[in-house]
Design a protein with these regions (language model features):
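N- or domain-start disorder-to-order transition segments that initiate the globular core
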Residues: 1-25
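Histidine-acidic residue clusters that define the catalytic metal-binding segment
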Residues: 1-7, 145-169
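Short acidic/His-enriched helical or mixed secondary-structure segments at domain edges of catalytic enzymes
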Residues: 125-143
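Short, structured secondary-structure elements
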Residues: 82-86, 120-126, 153
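Hydrophobic face of alpha-helices
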Residues: 48, 66, 100, 117-121, ...
Length: 169
């Protein structure tokens, strides 16, 4: 299969890959940041995941990121791994400029005030409780990773070792 893939590097170092799909009127803007839980320290985990949540808290010029995207007929989501954090927007192709504008704005002017940070800390701590503490064998993945990667940063889960790390961040 021969895909019409184009790779570009902008003057600011941003690497882009463009793959047109003529069979859809939708566009996906997918951004991968080269940061994940591997970049954390054992005594302070879950922060890459916390930052993923903070990226949806609005910015200087776009107080409601999801609101603007939804008005343009789109949606977004994100996830964090050991190696990178992925953010994506899906919206009608004619509104692609909206996604580029709001992604640029949140990268340059993310809202990081105390209120926004505390709200997202609570959300991530609750997510930790739901997925790790309040579920049968919810901590099994913690144990498996710690056994498999005894000295590597992959030994802690992306959500963190303990909710206290996020609470104290």
């Amino acid at each position: 299969m021969d895909l019409p893939l184009r790779r570009l590097t902008l003057a600011n170092g941003l690497r882009m890959v463009h793959l047109p799909d003529p069979d859809t009127k939708m566009v996906v803007l997918n951004l991968l940041y080269d940061v994940g839980s591997r970049d954390e320290q054992a005594n302070c985990t879950g922060l890459a995941h916390l930052f993923e949540h903070l990226m949806f808290g609005g910015s200087k010029n776009v107080p409601s990121y999801d609101g603007v995207l939804q008005q343009a007929g789109g949606r977004s989501n994100a996830w964090t791994s050991c190696d990178y954090t992925n953010y994506y927007d899906v919206l009608p192709a004619q509104n692609a400029a909206t996604a580029f504008r709001i992604e640029s704005d949140r990268l340059l002017g993310l809202r990081l005030d105390e209120e926004a940070i505390n709200i997202q800390k609570s959300v991530v701590i609750e997510e930790f409780k739901q997925t790790c503490l309040n579920r049968p064998f919810g901590d099994l993945w913690h144990e498996i990773r710690a056994a498999a990667y005894q000295v590597h940063p992959y030994r802690w889960p992306t959500i963190g070792i303990t909710p206290e790390h996020v609470a104290n961040a």
